[in-house]
Structures are given as C-alpha cells and as structure tokens.
C-alpha cells in the first residue's frame, strides 16, 4: 500500500508539474492566407523548428481565406480574441492601422532588429502609417509587374530597353515587322477587366498623376493625368486589335506575335513551357529559348517621375500580441526559414530582403532559364514600387475611393472609350473621371 501511495504521489506531482508547464507556455497564434495544404505544412515546419529552439513558446498556424480576413478579424476583435500575427496583403494594412489594431511599435522593433537597410525601400514606404510615421506592419514578400520584352529583337532593331516613355514609343514604332513580330505589344483595353487599371496605374505614377493631391482634392483631370491617358492609348496603334486583357497579352508574347508584355513575375514558368489556354491545353511556344531572349524592365520613367507596380504581402503584429510574436516574425524572415516560405511560389514570392536574393535565385529550376541579371532586376523592382492605393499620405477615405475606382473599373472604361471606341479623348476621359471620383468621394464623406 505504501508503495502504491508513493507511486500515486509521484504521478500526481508529475501531473502538477506538467500542468504548470502548460500554463506557463506562451501561445502565439499565426493566421496565414497561404492556406493551401502544402503551404500550411511549410509554415508548420518552420514553426516546429522555432518551437524546438524555444520550448516555452507554442506557435499555432491557422489558415484563413484572403477574402475573409477582414470579417474574421472583426469577429475576433469583438470577442477580444485577436490573433498575434496575420499574414495579409498590403491593402489590409491601412484599414487595420486606422482601426488601431496593429502594434506598430512591435513592427518597428522587428524591422530594426533585422536591419532596416536590408529591406527594400519601396515595401518599407508602403507600410508607413501616415498618422504616426511608424511602420504599421513588416513587409514579407510579393510580386513585381514589368514590361517583359524581346531583348534579342530590341538589339536587332537598335532599340534601348523599354524603360522611359520615349523608349516605349520608339519600340512601338519599330518592332512591328522586326523578327516576324506582328505587333509591338498587347495593350490592356478590355473595359470589363482590371488588367488595364494595373498597367495604366504604373504609367500614371511615372508621370506623377495621382487621384488626390496633398490636400485631398480630386486630381483626375490634371495635365499629368491627361498626358498619361494620351501616352497609354496612343500605343494602341501598334498593339493587338480589339478588347484585350492579360490572357491575350500573354499568348501574343508567347506565340512570338508581340515584342512587349505587361505582366507580373508569375509569367516566368509560362515563358518556359507555355501558359494554359482558356479552351484547354498549353501554348506551343515557337520561339527557341524565349526566356533567354526576354528582358525585364520593372521601372517605368515618365516625364515627371518613375514607378514600379506590384503587390506586397506583410506580416502584421496585432495589438495586444505577446512580445514573443516579434520573435516569431523575425524567425520567419531569417535564413532557411524565409527561403522555405519563398520556395512555395518563387515567382510570386520575391524576397523583400536584399540578403535573401541569392538564396531565392536557387528556389526554382525555371530560374535557370533566366540570366542572373534578370533575376537581380526582378528583386530590385521593389525599390520604386508604388500604388495609388498605398500612397503613405492618403487617409482611409481616399483609399476607399481608390478601391471604388478599381471596383467600378472606371479606368478600363475610359481607356476602351479612347483607344477602341473613339467616343472619348484623353481630355474628355479625364473630365469624366474627375466627375465620377468627386461623386464617389462625396458618397464616402
């Protein structure tokens, strides 16, 4: 009996100890919009390594849908159960920051710990909270939009890379007929698609054309905006006919019909093996070693500025998060841990850290079809990345109106009316945009 009692006593003490251990363990809840099974597994593997090195911290990876992030955060906030970390697109940062649910001091601490100089300038500028001047979230990865162009045919025609407006116009004049090309490019002109908005926005910013000025006035009919509309729509004379969007643009370039393509870094594998067609099957690329003959021009230089367009993903540390969350975020941006996440989609997960570029270049066999210079240019594309939606001094109302501009496809409609229908000019198109955006701003105020 004594031995039995002693055994029970020992077991009881062990259980008490284990209970105390469990209570003392810090739990960090990490929501990720990388929610596919294989991606969640990669996050969990990094978290497992972290927990092995930090046994007093438990990291719970919770997959969430991108479209439902705002609603789930709202529900969690109402229940006073916000997660500690959220992986989210840059478009969420301004709203969550304005709501006061992002721990900006924690984000600043992580960025400073990693080293501010290791981050690309563009992503850092995009996460600044204009109200506080602090970084509202930690940049993580993203994709870059660029002009992909036939470098071999540019050389044959004596053209310089399509960076400046003058360079692009010169290419539009000379490329048709060069090396069997039928057109210089495919222009986004479909009024029912967002592709024209994405391409035009880079053109506009490269001429310092923005929807609002510093005082919050609508500026859709400025000389800069009119000039951007004229430059963009004039390119249609050398472009594939008819309403076009990303699919037609991609196929025309892969088939050797057009010499320039506005597209994101997601095109990289398609230029090797052909993209999927709407009716099934893949494009059969007739151009030998198309990636090796393709150049990459992410930066556009206009008369009054320069710009790169793309998307940025961030890690937000939520208000009230345990300080351990900072340690977790930094871990996910460190060494092999960061590379393992980037490897999930190397074309769409371009590193924001300069120190991670060399490792990223090794993450896909498709990268072997591109020059090291092209891969460096892709990573460098972050330096001048800007978006209308994420201009640091725009407030929540202005950003909401920009979302309305995109949602109602105002820019694609105007481009179609100017370039295809001939029912508008750049001047009348800009005037119409001014009226529409002023009305939308009034609705939001």
Regions from the PLM with identified roles:
Residues 271-273, 279-280, 285-288, 302-410:
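C-terminal lobe and pocket-closing loops
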Residues 45-120, 126, 152-163, 259-260, ...:
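Extracytoplasmic "Venus flytrap"/periplasmic binding protein-like
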Residues 24-35, 57-62, 85, 136, ...:
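Short, well-ordered beta-strand elements
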Residues 27-45, 64, 398-403:
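Extracytoplasmic "Venus flytrap"
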């Amino acid at each position: 009996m004594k031995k039995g009692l002693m055994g029970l006593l020992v077991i009881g003490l062990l259980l008490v100890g284990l209970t105390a251990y469990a209570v003392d363990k810090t739990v960090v809840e990490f929501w990720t919009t990388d929610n596919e099974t294989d991606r969640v597994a990669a996050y969990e593997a990094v978290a497992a390594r972290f927990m092995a090195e930090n046994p007093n911290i438990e990291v719970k990876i919770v997959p969430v849908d991108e479209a439902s992030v705002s609603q789930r955060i709202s529900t969690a906030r109402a229940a006073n159960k916000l997660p500690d970390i959220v992986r989210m697109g840059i478009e969420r940062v301004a709203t969550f920051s304005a709501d006061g649910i992002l721990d900006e001091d924690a984000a600043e601490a992580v960025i400073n710990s990693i080293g501010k100089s290791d981050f690309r300038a563009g992503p850092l500028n995009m996460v600044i909270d204009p109200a506080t001047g602090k970084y509202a979230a930690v940049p993580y990865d993203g994709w870059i939009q660029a002009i992909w162009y036939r470098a071999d045919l540019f050389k044959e025609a004596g053209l310089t890379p399509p960076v400046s407006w003058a360079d692009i116009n010169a290419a539009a004049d000379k490329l048709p007929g060069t090396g069997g090309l039928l057109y210089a490019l495919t222009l986004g002109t479909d009024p029912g698609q967002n592709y024209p908005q994405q391409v035009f926005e880079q053109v506009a910013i490269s001429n310092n054309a923005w929807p609002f000025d510093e005082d919050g006035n609508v500026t859709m009919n400025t000389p800069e905006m009119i000039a951007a509309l004229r430059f963009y729509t004039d390119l249609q004379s050398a472009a594939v006919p008819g309403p076009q969007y990303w699919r037609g643009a991609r196929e025309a370039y892969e088939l050797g019909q057009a010499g320039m393509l506005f597209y994101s870094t997601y095109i990289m594998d398609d230029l090797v093996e052909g993209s999927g067609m709407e009716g099934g099957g893949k494009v059969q690329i007739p151009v030998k070693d198309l990636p090796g003959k393709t150049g990459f021009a992410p930066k556009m230089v206009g008369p009054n500025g320069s710009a790169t367009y793309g998307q940025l993903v961030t890690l937000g540390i939520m208000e009230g998060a345990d300080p351990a969350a900072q340690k977790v975020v930094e871990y996910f941006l460190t060494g092999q841990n960061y590379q393992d996440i980037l490897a999930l989609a190397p074309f769409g997960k371009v590193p924001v850290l300069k120190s991670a570029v060399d490792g990223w270049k090794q993450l896909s066999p498709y990268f072997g079809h591109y020059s090291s210079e092209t891969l460096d240019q892709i990573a460098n594309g972050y330096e001048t990345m800007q978006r209308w939606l994420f201009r640091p001094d725009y407030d929540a109302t202005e950003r909401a109106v920009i979302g309305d501009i995109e949602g109602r496809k105002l820019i694609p409609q105007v481009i179609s009316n100017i370039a295809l229908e001939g029912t508008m000019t750049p001047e009348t198109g800009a005037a119409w945009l001014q009226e529409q955006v002023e009305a939308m701003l009034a609705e939001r105020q």
